[in-house]
């Protein structure tokens, strides 16, 4: 029986990857939708907490605290990291140790007691400073996650529209350890959401297993269109005038994106995509340089179009051949593994 599943993978660095695979009857995997993701991970929650501190103490105090007491600053965020991973959203308050030096520095630089400024701040009713600690209302602590979790839910919801009959959503990675993030995902997507016992180490274990059994993924979906920059005969009714180039009496159009693979195309791992023949534009060359480009668009016209970027250059030695114009370079792109391979025959 085939099963379709999303794998939602988050990293401590602040990014998230979402992939969709179908488990085939032989146990191998087929990619159903190209990997997607964005800048929504645990680091974004840390930044929300930092902005929260700025609202209380002001930008100058936080900057000076980091400069003068870097060890205390880092320890504060290390403590926050532990609380972030354990937070489930069920308690009324979140309480943890808070550096007294920050309170002293605020009073020294601002000349007022912190309690007065707290009450005058936008978040004054949500926090207290009892005996070397900080107490934050659960509703405020949830707000640190809100933007990031909402982005994740929106991304997964959009993917669900493209992939019907989904069986499971698997959460792995450091940010997936958060009970609050897990509960929000279950609240939105129901019982199809689950995570392994150790979501952080699962990523490493998966990488090791894939290294040993790299053929387990039998089909992938291309995230980009891939092609070769080329020149072709200029046709004024079709081509941009600024791309017109004359060589040895022949008129060409330059920078054409000659597509080998289209974004969203399903390709078997190790499959040779149909190749194309390329000819040097002039004789007397000792080398030919193939420019490999990628684009987020399905059918880009020129390699200079928005969304196109250079993947790599391939230099071909032409010295053994005398008549270059009549000696074609047949180029194939091998797609499907963790690397893109360009073969020239």
PLM regions and their residue ranges:
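Gly/Thr-rich phosphate-binding beta-strand-loop-beta motif of the actin/hexokinase/Hsp70
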Residues: 1-31, 49, 325-345
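Conserved phosphate-binding catalytic cores of ATP/NTP-utilizing and phosphoryl-transfer enzymes
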Residues: 1-11, 201-218
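Flexible loop/turn segments at secondary-structure boundaries
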Residues: 15-16, 176-180, 203, 235, ...
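Gly/charged contiguous loops adjacent to phosphate- or pyrophosphate-bearing nucleotide/cofactor binding elements
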Residues: 20, 24-25, 37-186, 235-239, ...
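Interdomain boundary/hinge elements
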Residues: 60-63, 194-200, 217-227
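Acidic low-complexity intrinsically disordered segments
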Residues: 104-147, 158, 217-345
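Conserved phosphate-binding/catalytic loops in two-lobed NTP-binding clefts
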Residues: 183-208
């Amino acid at each position: 029986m085939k099963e379709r599943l999303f794998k939602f993978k988050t990293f401590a660095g602040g990014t998230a990857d979402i992939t969709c695979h179908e488990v085939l009857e032989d146990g191998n995997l087929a990619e159903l939708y190209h990997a997607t993701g964005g800048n929504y991970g645990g680091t974004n929650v840390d930044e929300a907490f930092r902005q929260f501190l700025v609202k209380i103490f002001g930008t100058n105090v936080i900057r000076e605290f980091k400069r003068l007491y870097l060890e205390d600053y880092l320890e504060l965020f290390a403590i926050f990291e532990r609380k972030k991973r354990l937070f489930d959203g069920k308690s009324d308050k979140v309480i943890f140790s808070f550096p007294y030096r920050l309170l002293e520095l605020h009073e020294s630089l601002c000349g007022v007691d912190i309690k007065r400024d707290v009450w005058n701040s936008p978040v004054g009713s949500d926090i207290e400073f009892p005996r070397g600690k900080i107490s934050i209302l659960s509703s405020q602590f949830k707000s640190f996650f809100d933007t990031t979790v909402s982005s994740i839910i929106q991304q997964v919801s959009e993917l669900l529209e493209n992939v019907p009959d989904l069986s499971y959503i698997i959460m792995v990675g450091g940010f997936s350890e958060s009970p609050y993030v897990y509960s929000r995902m279950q609240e939105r997507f129901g019982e199809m959401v689950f995570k392994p016992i150790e979501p952080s180490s699962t990523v490493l274990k998966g990488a090791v297993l894939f290294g040993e059994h790299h053929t387990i993924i039998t089909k992938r979906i291309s995230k980009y269109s891939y092609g070769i920059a080329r020149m072709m005969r200029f046709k004024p009714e079709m081509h941009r005038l600024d791309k017109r180039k004359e060589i040895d009496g022949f008129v060409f159009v330059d920078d054409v994106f000659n597509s080998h693979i289209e974004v969203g195309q399903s390709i078997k791992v190790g499959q040779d995509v149909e190749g194309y023949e390329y000819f040097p534009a002039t004789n007397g060359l000792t080398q030919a340089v193939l420019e490999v480009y990628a684009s987020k668009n399905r059918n880009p016209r020129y390699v200079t179009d928005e969304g196109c970027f250079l993947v790599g250059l391939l230099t071909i030695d032409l010295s053994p051949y005398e008549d270059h114009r009549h000696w074609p370079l047949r180029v194939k792109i091998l797609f499907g593994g963790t690397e893109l391979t360009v073969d020239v025959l």
